């Protein structure tokens, strides 16, 4: 990295630098899962977005026997996780930590037999914080009433220096007070809509709650350091409800909280889990496929990339960050609530960086108030002669994460003998396919938008860590969401539409035919019949009676149909509808036929009216 700070990187400059700056590169995806798909191919489901939600959904769809295409705009998979390689080392520049309380991701880790490593700074030997222009550590006189709480909170006596226990005890008390009301707001934190008690807190920001506490500057600085790393966003923009949710999910305990959000990681990076899931599901994958438009019509979905490539499917899943959803054109248009949420954006937009340092690196955690460029700095790799630090800040406007001098200044406030030699970071706020870090909803957004973001719209379903119910903003939440939506789509395509989805499904499949005609609706799953004449998975059915078989323009009919060399008379239609495979051996049409002669007659009569 350069030793001198330069001008702010533009979004255009960021795109030019993707994957190649300073020798940092995305680790490759191995296996057949990386094989591309040809434009014009037809699929059962298209998944837009190759983060953990999209990869999870694609795997589940493939396990259900559905032909699945995964489209990713970047030149890598992973979304807001990114295992980057620098020399012989790898760094998780995005999502990183996991825990057994996060049941979805932990089940995947166990399923694939992946190995776990620990972050030393999560159980620090020293706890420091910056207040009133100097470094502080806890004093015994201030701490004795809380010391027992820190020692006993997880049922065991930690083997840590007394001064560290003092610092952790102060933090435990502050965190407990800050999150008062979490149990009432989220009695079942993995099912937030079980109760509406959380609505009483939804208009409150993190800043509002801090102001209510009326803390001393010293105590507020310690608490703000912790919250700054959690929010990765300005406190005035961050919903207090999000921090209550994290606390409730962590069992309302500071030790479990720290373990869940910053201690345990995949030894070989998040890419190791992503690879395992891809090789298990083996969907078709197309990288560099930025989607411009998603069209629905006549029971099919057409996805068009910015390069003009077009793919068709019976359904689609948009597994995208909330902040970028509005940048894709949808026809029919999205629910206004989804568009408004995307344009408002969630608050997460801060900084995560690694700093390689020279000098003796202890296991430590350092905290600073929101006004400082970095909220939290802690040990990733300790060593006598050097190591690696991880740091978080609430805004990229306060620090250039790629500037060695800027990071050096922040680190030396706590440990003046350390020399920063290199920084490694990724500008998530500049990446047009993320436009921010993990999801931290703004005040009021959970009430206004969360339920709407999760609702399907016709044949398009929505997934992502930003709309998870439990660990929203975590890898676990992305996997939760991808699993749920994949199984909804499988149920829909199998004809088992859940009651909550029925209205949306009916609206999507509404055609210019008699309402409630069940036989025709079987056809409408694959065949459009609107006046545009555009095709879906199957050819458009408007004007079929009396037309030469396999003659509709711009549709790739199978040789089985082209060889019939006849017209669609009522007799031909009846024979084909009774048993397509028998009438046209080798047809690609995956439909068993209509057994009832009266149903076939009604369907043929209906088709004759579509002119």
Regions found by a protein language model. Give the residues of each.
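FAD-dinucleotide binding site
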Residues: 2-507
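Hydrophobic aliphatic residues
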Residues: 18, 320, 545-548, 577, ...
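Extracytoplasmic/secreted envelope proteins and their assembly/folding machinery
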Residues: 102, 106, 207, 274, ...
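A short secondary-structure junction motif
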Residues: 247-254, 544, 548-551, 580-584
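Sequence/structural segment immediately N-terminal to covalent heme-attachment motifs in c-type
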Residues: 508-532, 541, 603
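Gly/Gly-Pro-rich "capping" loops immediately C-terminal to redox-active cysteine motifs
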Residues: 517, 528-570, 590-593
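C-terminal capping alpha-helices of c-type cytochrome domains
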Residues: 567-611
């Amino acid at each position: 990295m350069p030793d001198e700070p330069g001008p702010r990187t533009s979004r255009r400059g960021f795109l030019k630098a993707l994957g190649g700056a300073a020798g940092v590169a995305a680790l490759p995806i191995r296996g057949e899962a990386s094989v591309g798909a040809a434009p014009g191919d037809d699929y059962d489901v298209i998944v837009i977005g190759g983060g953990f939600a999209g990869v999870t959904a694609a795997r589940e769809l493939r396990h259900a026997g559905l032909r699945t295409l995964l489209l990713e705009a970047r030149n890598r998979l992973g979304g807001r996780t990114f295992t980057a390689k620098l020399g012989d080392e790898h760094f998780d520049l995005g999502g990183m930590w996991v825990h057994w309380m996060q049941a979805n991701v932990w089940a995947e880790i166990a399923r694939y037999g992946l190995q776990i490593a620990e972050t030393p700074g999560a159980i620090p030997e020293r706890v420091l914080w910056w207040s009133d222009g100097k470094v502080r550590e806890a004093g015994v006189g201030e701490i004795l009433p809380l010391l027992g709480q820190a020692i006993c909170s997880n049922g065991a006596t930690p083997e840590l220096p007394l001064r560290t226990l003092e610092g952790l005890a102060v933090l435990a008390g502050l965190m407990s007070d800050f999150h008062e009301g979490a149990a009432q707001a989220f009695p079942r934190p993995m099912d937030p809509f079980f109760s509406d008690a959380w609505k009483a807190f939804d208009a409150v920001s993190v800043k509002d709650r801090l102001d209510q506490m009326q803390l001393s500057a010293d105590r507020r600085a310690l608490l703000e350091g912790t919250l700054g790393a959690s929010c990765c966003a300005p406190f005035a923009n961050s919903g207090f409800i999000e921090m209550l949710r994290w606390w409730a999910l962590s069992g309302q305990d500071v030790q479990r909280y720290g373990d869940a959000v910053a201690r345990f990681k995949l030894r070989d990076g998040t890419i190791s889990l992503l690879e395992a899931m891809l090789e298990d599901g083996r969907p078709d994958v197309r990288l560099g496929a930025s989607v411009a438009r998603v069209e629905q019509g006549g029971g099919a979905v057409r996805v068009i990339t910015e390069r003009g490539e077009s793919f068709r499917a019976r359904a689609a899943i948009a597994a995208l960050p909330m902040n970028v959803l509005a940048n894709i054109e949808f026809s029919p248009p999205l629910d206004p609530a989804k568009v408004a949420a995307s344009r408002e954006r969630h608050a997460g937009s801060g900084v995560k960086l690694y700093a390689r340092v020279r000098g003796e690196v202890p296991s430590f955690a350092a905290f600073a108030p929101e006004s400082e460029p970095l909220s939290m700095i802690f040990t990733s790799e300790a060593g006598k002669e050097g190591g690696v630090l991880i740091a978080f800040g609430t805004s990229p406007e306060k620090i250039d994460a790629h500037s060695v001098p800027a990071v050096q200044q922040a680190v030396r406030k706590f440990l003046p003998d350390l020399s920063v030699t290199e920084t490694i970071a990724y500008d998530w706020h500049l990446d047009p396919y993320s436009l921010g870090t993990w999801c931290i909803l703004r005040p009021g957004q959970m009430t206004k938008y969360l339920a709407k973001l999760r609702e399907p719209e016709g044949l398009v379903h929505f997934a992502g860590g930003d709309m998870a119910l439990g660990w929203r903003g975590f890898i676990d939440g992305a996997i939760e969401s991808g699993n749920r939506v994949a199984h909804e789509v499988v149920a829909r395509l199998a004809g088992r539409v859940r009651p909550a989805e029925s209205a949306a499904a009916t609206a999507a499949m509404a055609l210019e035919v008699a309402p409630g005609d069940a036989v025709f609706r079987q056809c409408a799953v694959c065949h459009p019949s609107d006046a545009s004449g555009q095709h879906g998975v199957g050819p458009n059915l408007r004007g079929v009676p009396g037309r030469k078989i396999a003659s509709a323009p711009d549709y790739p009919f199978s040789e089985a149909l082209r060889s019939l060399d006849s017209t669609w008379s009522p007799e031909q239609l009846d024979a084909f509808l009774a048993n397509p495979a028998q009438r046209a051996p080798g047809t690609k049409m995956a439909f068993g036929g209509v057994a009832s002669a009266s149903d076939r007659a009604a369907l043929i009569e209906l088709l004759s009216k579509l002119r």
